[in-house]
């Protein structure tokens, strides 16, 4: 009973804050009200009025308070709303501006912190729809789909991103490296050549495998 009273009190304070023109306070009170505030109506209310900062505060507060073990569907829904909001900010910012850089940084920080709460297929489709392929590669790598991330980067010609992943990610297998580097070499032979001479690659593959890989690349060049 006490929780219902608390929820009702927060709802009244949220409505008072909206009437006073303070959407941020309203968002905080709606979040504190929990399920006493109908989620869809509350979120859409902020969205329809263009109050994105208040919407983000409401969603983040609800997500922080939710228990992934007991409320997995709620957590997934909140995370989906938030990633969609982050994507909207990225797409709404002018390319090359500080605002665009900050929006991209915020999106990737959110993905890094909450990837396990996101629906992988839905998030992949969202990022593909808006052609945010670099962010999609980042998401896939964060979610553990490292080879898929590397293949995507190869497709979009991001050899620097491919080599960075091969260098830094311990989940990349020697087999993956041997399959990926010939493709990377065809796209950017200079950067790939530098990587082939790196100590990192020697440590990951070993001398014998590295010699075999270089031979494979050389044969590929001669056969073209």
Where are these regions (language model features)?
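Extended alpha-helical solenoid/arm regions of large eukaryotic scaffolding proteins
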Residues: 1-224
């Amino acid at each position: 009973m006490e929780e219902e009273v608390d929820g009702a009190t927060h709802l009244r304070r949220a409505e008072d804050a909206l009437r006073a023109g303070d959407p941020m306070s309203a968002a905080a009170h709606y979040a504190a009200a929990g399920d006493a505030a109908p989620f869809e109506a509350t979120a859409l209310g902020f969205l329809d009025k263009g109050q994105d900062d208040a919407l983000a505060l409401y969603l983040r507060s609800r997500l922080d308070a939710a228990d992934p073990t007991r409320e997995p569907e709620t957590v997934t829904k909140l995370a989906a709303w938030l990633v969609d909001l982050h994507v909207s900010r990225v797409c709404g910012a002018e390319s090359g501006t500080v605002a665009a850089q900050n929006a991209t940084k915020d999106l990737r920080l959110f993905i890094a912190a909450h990837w396990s709460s996101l629906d992988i297929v839905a998030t992949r489709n969202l990022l593909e729809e808006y052609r945010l392929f670099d962010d999609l590669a980042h998401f896939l790598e964060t979610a553990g789909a490292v080879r898929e991330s590397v293949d995507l980067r190869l497709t979009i010609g991001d050899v620097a991103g491919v080599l960075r992943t091969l260098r830094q990610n311990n989940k990349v297998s020697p087999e993956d490296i041997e399959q990926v580097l010939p493709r990377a070499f065809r796209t950017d032979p200079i950067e790939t050549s530098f990587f082939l001479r790196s100590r990192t690659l020697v440590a990951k593959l070993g001398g014998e495998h590295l010699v075999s890989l270089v031979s494979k690349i050389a044969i590929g060049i001669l056969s073209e």
